[in-house]
């Protein structure tokens, strides 16, 4: 398949083990191919009746799935992981067409997706409570039980991966899930739904509804939904939390960030430069945990900046389906204009553009309407600048200088966000001392933007709460029942 040829020809809702058209609507949306600007799908947003049918189907499937043993669920999840692994290139291609990231990166995403399913398949058979001995031979025990129908609401930067990150632990615990992808990227999650069905989950266990804010509201407020997990912006996350609170539903929120990356003068320069590029330019900079505030110790500021600019200018921009492309288009034109607007404001506030920050027009005529820009490196930045304070969500790196460890820690933590942070240094004592003080949920030492499924991922402060990945996520998709067993006579106060 090549850029500019794909068109969606099947329904984009999934319910009861099959693709379906929604029975009612809350509007229509268009999905684009960012590389070419073409419309690849016009689809109906699910209305309240469709959402209710999806939830009821999930509720029925939950009754079957929750009664299966952990090992039975394990085998089915492993089969789903195997299918994803076999269809890796197909799924990655679909992800690239609808999202715009390079096929090189998309394959990484699909690999972490099947690894996520394998990881939670391994945990499915090991979930257990504990036994507590009480006086007189009595005892108590706990049971870890599923919640019921969970809702996953995904973001457009990692459509397939996020669906796996949310559904794998949910299903491993015995839950069902209704998933709503971003209306910008509605396509690839349907492949996951079909794969789950092929692997053997009960029909209705993983359903997909399409739509925007109205559809999300129907899901969050549905009386039979037990939990909501959301990935996206802080303002939307706040609304999700408010709507869910009315039904006393637990939520997991993975929201935005403006993360610090601290480069000390004793760093390995080559690795620090590579880390800074990884922290800013993956998926065209459209990554919530990106380390976009790059603090560089003054002794190496000029050397570091020169090398970063040199490497940034070498990034191959263009058709994301070509093997040598390393940066594709941004998600859509409004977002491209928004990111370019941040660069304009940065210059007005005194920042200096060392490279990029402007529109890129590929030579291929079929890409002329795509949403491309050159990756941007800003210097002469101050902590009070808009480009340093607000999440840009594009390929824009802001470089700031610092003198001392104490100073940079205070500045790094001076943000309402707390998703991620990183430090590059050869001093292992300093590395651990610094990350202990950083107010962020995911910290990197001498690397950045790696997300092994074994490690919990989530934020502090306004970047959200709850965790995805790692063993601890089981606690966010299950509930604990305590059973007290009396082996003697009842001691009554009456």
Curated annotation (Swiss-Prot):
UniProt GO BP: aldehyde metabolic process; carnitine biosynthetic process; protein homotetramerization
Matching InterPro entries: Ald_DH/histidinol_DH (IPR016161), Ald_DH_C (IPR016163), Ald_DH_CS_CYS (IPR016160), Ald_DH_CS_GLU (IPR029510), Ald_DH_N (IPR016162), Aldehyde_DH_dom (IPR015590)
Predominant location category: cytoplasm
Catalytic residues (positions): 254 (proton acceptor), 288 (nucleophile)
Full protein name: 4-trimethylaminobutyraldehyde dehydrogenase
GO (cellular component) term, any one: cytosol
One GO MF term: aminobutyraldehyde dehydrogenase (NAD+) activity
Reactions catalysed: 4-(trimethylamino)butanal + NAD(+) + H2O = 4-(trimethylamino)butanoate + NADH + 2 H(+); an aldehyde + NAD(+) + H2O = a carboxylate + NADH + 2 H(+); 4-aminobutanal + NAD(+) + H2O = 4-aminobutanoate + NADH + 2 H(+); formaldehyde + NAD(+) + H2O = formate + NADH + 2 H(+)
Root EC class: oxidoreductase
PROSITE patterns per the UniProt record, alphabetical: ALDEHYDE_DEHYDR_CYS, ALDEHYDE_DEHYDR_GLU
Job description of the protein: Converts gamma-trimethylaminobutyraldehyde into gamma-butyrobetaine with high efficiency (in vitro). Can catalyze the irreversible oxidation of a broad range of aldehydes to the corresponding acids in an NAD-dependent reaction, but with low efficiency. Catalyzes the oxidation of aldehydes arising from biogenic amines and polyamines.
Annotated positions of the N6-succinyllysine modification: 30, 59
Positions carrying N6-acetyllysine: 30, 298, 344
Pathways involved: Amine and polyamine biosynthesis; carnitine biosynthesis
Domain of life: Eukaryota
Description of how the protein assembles with itself and partners: Homotetramer.
């Amino acid at each position: 398949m090549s850029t500019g040829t794909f068109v969606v020809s099947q329904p984009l809702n999934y319910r009861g083990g099959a693709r379906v058209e929604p029975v009612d609507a809350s509007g229509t949306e268009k999905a684009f191919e960012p590389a070419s600007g073409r419309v690849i799908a016009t689809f109906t947003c699910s209305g309240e009746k469709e959402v209710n049918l999806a939830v009821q189907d999930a509720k029925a499937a939950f009754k079957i799935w929750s009664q299966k043993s952990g090992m039975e669920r394990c085998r089915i999840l492993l089969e789903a992981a195997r299918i994803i692994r076999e269809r890796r290139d197909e799924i990655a291609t679909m992800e690239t067409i609808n999202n715009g990231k390079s096929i090189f990166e998309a394959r990484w995403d699909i690999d972490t997706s099947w690894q996520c399913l394998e990881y939670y398949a391994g945990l499915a058979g090991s979930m257990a409570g504990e036994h507590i001995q009480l006086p007189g031979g009595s005892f108590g025990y706990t049971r870890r039980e599923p919640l019921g129908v969970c809702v996953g609401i995904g973001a457009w930067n990692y459509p397939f991966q996020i669906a796996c990150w949310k559904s794998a632990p949910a299903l491993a615990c015995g839950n069902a899930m209704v998933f709503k992808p971003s209306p910008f990227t509605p396509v690839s999650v349907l492949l996951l739904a079909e794969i789950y069905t092929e692997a053997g989950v009960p029909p209705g266990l993983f359903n997909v509804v399409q739509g925007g804010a109205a559809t999300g509201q129907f899901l969050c407020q549905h009386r039979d939904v037990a939990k909501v997990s959301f990935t996206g912006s802080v303002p939307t996350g706040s609304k999700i939390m408010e709507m869910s609170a009315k039904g006393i539903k637990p939520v997991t929120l993975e929201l935005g960030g403006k993360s610090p990356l601290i480069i000390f003068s004793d760093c390995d320069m080559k690795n620090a430069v590579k880390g800074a590029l990884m922290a800013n330019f993956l998926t065209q900079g459209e990554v919530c945990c990106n380390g976009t505030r790059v603090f560089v110790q003054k002794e190496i500021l000029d050397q570091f900046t020169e090398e970063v600019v040199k490497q940034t200018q070498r990034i191959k921009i263009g058709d994301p389906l070509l093997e040598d492309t390393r940066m594709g288009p941004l998600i859509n034109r409004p977002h491209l204009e928004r990111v370019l607007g941040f660069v304009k404001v940065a210059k007005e506030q005194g920042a200096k553009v060392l490279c990029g920050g402007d529109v890129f027009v590929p030579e291929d005529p079929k890409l002329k309407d795509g949403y491309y820009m050159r990756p941007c490196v800003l210097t002469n930045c101050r902590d009070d600048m808009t480009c340093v304070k607000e999440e840009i969500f594009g390929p824009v790196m802001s470089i700031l200088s610092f003198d001392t460890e104490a100073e940079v820690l205070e500045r790094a933590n001076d943000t309402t966000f707390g998703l991620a942070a990183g430090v590059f240094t050869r001093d292992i004592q300093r590395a651990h001392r610094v990350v202990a003080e950083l107010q962020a949920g995911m910290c990197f030492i001498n690397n950045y933007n790696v997300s092994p499924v074994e490690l919990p991922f989530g934020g502090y402060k306004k970047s959200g709460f709850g965790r995805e990945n790692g063993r601890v996520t089981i606690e966010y998709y299950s509930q604990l029942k305590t059973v007290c067993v009396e082996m003697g006579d009842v001691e009554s106060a009456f």
